[in-house]
UniProtKB/Swiss-Prot annotation:
It comes from the Bacteria. GO terms for biological process: glycine decarboxylation via glycine cleavage system; nucleoside metabolic process. This is Probable glycine dehydrogenase (decarboxylating) subunit 1. The gene is gcvPA. It catalyses: N(6)-[(R)-lipoyl]-L-lysyl-[glycine-cleavage complex H protein] + glycine + H(+) = N(6)-[(R)-S(8)-aminomethyldihydrolipoyl]-L-lysyl-[glycine-cleavage complex H protein] + CO2.
Length: 446
């Protein structure tokens, strides 16, 4: 950021304005014996061209998806982002993450959020969406807290394979709220066991949680899981990848009471892991328990359409002790990105992105499975992500593939498991997929 230092006369003017004669007068509260008397040992000052050259040199050590072909996933995906998204979101009237405190003054911001809510409801086939949460993990944690509040029960069952980081955030939220009962269902072939789930869900369970697709990219039996939840009076909470809904059934169609998701695939860059977008939707009967902000449409005194923050008595700035959540802000800029992305692509465009991602992922999976020493770890159907068992440690595969300017995937050893988690998006070309396979064959020496 450009910075011009204050002149001596400007400093004197500021000191005079606050009633002191020197900077030392501001330090009277600090004992003499602990004050630093010498000059700081700093390197010599540089001019702007030198600083720019230094920082650009440091930044060049970072390699992004603009430099390497990426097969990384695990919650952050390298989907194409239309240039129009950055152009629109960079407009000064949008360039803030905050809903204004006098919200109704900013009708444009409220309308943008309202459009986002409407699009998300259509995508998830749910009745109500809030203005957004911090990210997919916090949205899931807030969903479970909401389920406990609604049902008066204290346990949650995770039906399948949840993202480990989402699971960690969930446990942190629940422990802070005095709950410690997160029960993990048994996994079979990378998805939750329906028979085992039936034994776990009972009268004390507030919510049955499932991620679709799950962390491994596999597809859970969501209809069976939802039926078990409802048979036992629990709420059915689904964390669904929004981009997958261009191809897979929407949570509302198979009975989700609360549906959340990580909105990063909808026009938000990977950006070292954030900021991202927490999608949060519910059925109509739960609207007064939903956390976060809600934008509604109304009529002003002249009969014109207008937008307001509605049902604010749920929020902590109105009734702190009875608030549904302590979240009082939202990811408005990221929500705007998602709204623009969905509007630009439309229904058919989203279907094409999802279908291409799935088709290319299955093409690559088949090619990799044919390489001696490599195999798919699970047999369950998957969307655009799958786990590969490798003949050498996954970390070694990743390291060697970097030499070919390839991000090979996510090493599951980070989570105490074996395998390489590989993700494929619509951006990948057939030439890139074939090159990935060729390089895999070459690095293992089998």
């Amino acid at each position: 950021m450009p910075f011009i230092v204050n002149t001596a006369s400007e400093r004197d003017e500021m000191l005079k304005a606050i009633g002191v004669s020197s900077f030392d007068d501001l330090l009277v509260a600090i004992p003499e014996e602990i004050r630093l008397k010498r000059a700081l040992d700093l390197f010599p000052a540089s001019d702007e061209p030198q600083v720019r050259k230094l920082l650009e040199g440091l930044a060049s050590a970072n390699k992004s998806t603009a430099d390497y072909v990426s097969f990384l996933g695990g919650g952050a995906y390298d989907h194409f982002i239309p240039a129009a998204i950055k152009t629109i979101t960079s407009r000064s009237e949008f360039y803030t993450a905050y809903t204004p405190y006098q919200a109704e003054v900013s009708q444009g911001t409220l309308q943008a959020i309202y459009e986002y809510q409407s699009l998300v409801c259509r995508l998830y086939e749910m009745d109500v969406a809030n203005a957004s949460m911090y990210d997919g993990a916090t949205a899931l944690a807030e969903a479970v807290l909401m389920a406990m509040n609604v049902t008066g029960r204290s346990k949650v069952v995770v039906a399948g394979k949840l993202h480990p980081y989402n699971s960690s955030v969930l446990k942190t939220y629940l422990e802070a709220a005095g709950h410690h009962a997160v029960i993990q269902n048994t996994l079979e072939e990378g998805v939750g066991s329906i028979d085992a789930l039936k034994e776990l869900v009972g009268a004390s369970v507030a919510a049955v949680v499932v991620q679709q697709p799950n962390f491994y990219g596999s597809l859970e039996d969501v209809e069976a899981i939802g039926a078990i939840a409802h048979e036992n009076g629990a709420l059915f909470v689904v964390s669904a990848d929004p981009l997958s809904l261009g191809m897979l059934a929407a949570p509302g169609s198979y009975g989700a009471d609360i549906a959340v998701g990580e909105g990063q695939p909808l026009g938000t860059p990977q950006s070292f892991g954030g900021p991202y977008l927490g999608i949060f939707t519910v059925k109509q009967q739960l609207v007064r328990k939903i956390p976060g902000r809600l934008v509604g449409m109304t009529k002003d005194r002249d009969g014109e359409d207008g937008f307001i923050l509605t049902l604010q008595t749920r929020e902590q700035h109105i009734r702190r002790e009875k608030a549904t959540s302590n979240i009082c802000s939202n990811q408005a800029l990221n929500a705007l990105q998602a709204a623009i992305y969905l509007s630009l692509l439309g229904k058919e465009g989203l279907q094409q992105v999802a279908t291409q991602s799935a088709q290319k992922a299955h093409y690559l999976a088949g090619k990799i499975a044919a390489i001696p020493g490599f195999s798919l770890k699970y047999k369950a159907p998957f969307f655009r992500e799958f786990v590969v068992e490798t003949p050498i440690p996954a970390a070694a595969v990743i390291e060697r593939m970097l030499e070919h300017k390839l991000f090979a995937g996510h090493d599951l050893a980070v989570h105490g498991e074996t395998g390489l988690l590989v993700a494929v998006t619509e951006k990948r070309t057939k030439a890139e997929l074939d090159s990935f396979v060729d390089k895999l064959e070459g690095i293992t020496g089998i």
